[in-house]
């Protein structure tokens, strides 16, 4: 019996020893094991992006469009008068010479004069969730030379020479733990030619507004809870990625509204056809 116990103990000791490389079973100095463990963990490439409290960055999203992060973001609005830091009046846009008229008036940014993301005085005739990015795809001679090459959706959205493929495009804006969706309706801030940032990997160019690279409407500002000037992330999104929300309810230019109207027309037409066939 005693021999069996000794033999079993020897087998167990041999199995434990096999788990360590040669010499690993010798005594370590105090703290040496924990030091080696820390070094082995910190040498792992998947943990090198950990933040100070040890949380590993999440894997990148699999999306057609990447996030542009930490972009200085300013608030602008339809009908805005020119100022020192905004020399271009916003009663017109890069693609609409009567923007304020088509919108229905000035999109007053004062929170005290707004309700439910709308200016209190009227219901906008266009989507109050809008943005500006520093690129315009058209010029007096048609599309800019680089437009067909750098705009990812150019071919699928092309409707003829000189007709913008950027106006109305949806983007997502992220601030802290909230994400808002809005339509691209103007070019700016300051520039209309920076395709290397809008569609590429460059950062926004320096300007009078702390290097701002995105303008957002008062509705976007209010939904996100951001300041008039703040820092956000943004990216383009295809329409089928946009969930319904307050950005889906209003505006003749709003993809949701347009689609809902078309569905309603088809339903009415089908009902009329059914009635006539009886």
Q: Which residues does each predicted region cover?
A:
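Bacterial N-terminal signal peptides that target proteins for export
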Residues: 2-10
């Amino acid at each position: 019996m005693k021999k069996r116990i000794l033999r079993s103990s020897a087998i167990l000791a041999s199995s434990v020893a096999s788990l360590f490389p040669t010499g690993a079973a010798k005594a370590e100095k105090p703290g040496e094991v924990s030091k080696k463990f820390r070094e082995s963990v910190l040498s792992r490439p998947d943990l090198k992006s950990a933040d100070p409290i040890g949380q590993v960055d999440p894997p990148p999203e699999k999306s057609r469009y990447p996030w542009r992060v930490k972009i200085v973001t300013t608030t602008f609005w339809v009908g805005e008068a020119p100022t020192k830091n905004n020399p271009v009046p916003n009663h017109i846009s890069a693609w609409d010479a009567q923007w304020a008229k088509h919108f229905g008036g000035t999109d007053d940014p004062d929170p005290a004069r707004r309700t439910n993301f709308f200016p209190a005085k009227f219901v906008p005739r266009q989507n109050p969730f809008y943005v500006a990015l520093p690129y315009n795809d058209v010029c007096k001679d048609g599309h800019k030379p680089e437009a067909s090459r750098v705009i990812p959706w150019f071919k699928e959205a092309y409707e003829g020479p000189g007709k913008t493929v950027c106006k109305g495009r949806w983007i997502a804006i992220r601030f802290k733990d909230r994400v808002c969706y809005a339509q691209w309706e103007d070019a700016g801030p300051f520039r209309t030619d920076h395709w290397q940032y809008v569609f590429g990997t460059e950062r926004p160019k320096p300007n009078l507004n702390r290097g701002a690279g995105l303008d957002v409407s008062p509705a976007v500002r209010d939904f996100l809870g951001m300041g008039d000037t703040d820092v956000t992330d943004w990216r383009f999104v295809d329409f089928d990625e946009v969930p319904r929300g307050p950005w889906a309810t209003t505006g003749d230019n709003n993809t949701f509204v347009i689609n809902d109207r078309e569905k309603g027309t088809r339903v009415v037409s089908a009902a009329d056809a059914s009635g006539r066939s009886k």
